[in-house]
Amino acid sequence: MIENAKILSGRFPDARIQIYAAQDVPADVIRILSEIPCVKLVRVPNKGVQNTFDRFEAIDDPDCSIMFVRDADSRPHARDIACIEDFLQSEKAIHIIRDHHWHSMHPIMAGMWGLRKSAMREPMAAIVKRWLNRGRIFNHPMNVKLNKKSDQVFLKDAIYPLFKGQALIHDRVGKLEPAAALTPFRVDIKDRMFCGQVYRFDTSGCEFTEFDP
């Protein structure tokens, strides 16, 4: 996340990089992040899987007009940034990126989307709360059982139906919408760097990419 914040701070100096950090994040990481320009740290309690929804509520901040959501274990790179620029230059309500065959399993990848506040009819916090509360209704036919994919299930159930007709979609595989609904990628994949590629560290601390494009 530290490297991501440095890259984004340099590329989008007028944007705010809002990082949601639970209480178990090491103090030295918090210190380094807090010193990076444009970074705003939001400390949240440890809530397990439910923490994955915290970042979606950035759109509710009074001074946020457009939100882009990214995972901490993926790098922003030229291909991803070009997609962001396409959305910023459009008038679409929601931005969706799918850049791997596994991404076709979900209408919206939880760490690869964006949203304009002007398209919202109610706060994101209210939408999230309503969806989570379904799991507390005994025998509700849409009962929610939280797991590590719950954020993507939420986006499929509660967000995609609202905005799919107003979406700018970059999709390399193209299984979920007709080709005419898709926007082509302007930057080719280089060095395995597709949008959403996961970075890991080996035992010596060297960084490597996890998946083939």
Task: Give residue spans per PLM region.
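N-terminal anchoring/stem segment of glycosyltransferases
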Residues: 1-46
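Membrane-embedded transmembrane-helix bundle of lipid-linked glycan/lipid transferases
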Residues: 2-3, 59, 86
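A short, glycine-/small-residue-rich helix N-cap motif at loop->alpha-helix starts
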Residues: 47-54
